[in-house]
Amino acid sequence: CFTGLRISDILALRWNQILNTEEFAIIEKKTGKKRTLRINPQLQQHIVECYEQIQPVSVKSPILVSQKGTIFTIQRINVVLKEIKKKYRLKVKNFSCHSLRKTFGRQVYNMNSENSELALVKLMELFNHSSIAITKRYLGLRQEEILETYDVLSF
């Protein structure tokens, strides 16, 4: 939720990549492109707390492993998210790994609403999209803009 990474890239992360560092780089599995990420102080603290709580076998261990020591699958994580949604009666239409990535994008966009074009350029780079049009479609902005037309109509 703090990075906008695809779940496939999160599952490949190791503790030594993210522990006690302000930045780290990955090669995205889907695109093969390099991506550098910054870890803000709040997330750095959370990572340290998780590491101390989990006490992984090695600093080179994956960050998301089951109690059996195996790396979670995307499908399993989505099942857990659905269980969380049900348990806490979350009023969310879609609650999955992918929807969390989109939520990250929408949050960045909404926080920069005074300069939405710059926000879209930033998100295009963060998501490694090839165009702003793809980023807008990914975030559902075009559809939202169309639907907002109905809100301003008066009779």
Task: Tell where the protein language model's regions lie, with residue ranges.
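Active-site-proximal segment of tyrosine recombinases
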Residues: 9-10, 105, 113-129
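C-terminal catalytic core of Y-nucleophile DNA break-rejoin enzymes
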Residues: 29-49, 60-82
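Helix N-cap/coil-helix junction residues
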Residues: 5, 56, 90-92, 129, ...
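Key DNA-contacting residues within the recognition helix of helix-turn-helix
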Residues: 11, 106, 135-139
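Short amphipathic helical patch at the helix-1/turn junction of helix-turn-helix
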Residues: 1-2, 109-114
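Conserved tyrosine-mediated DNA breakage-rejoining catalytic core shared by Y-recombinases
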Residues: 3, 7-8, 12-43
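Short basic/aromatic active-site micro-motif
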Residues: 92-111
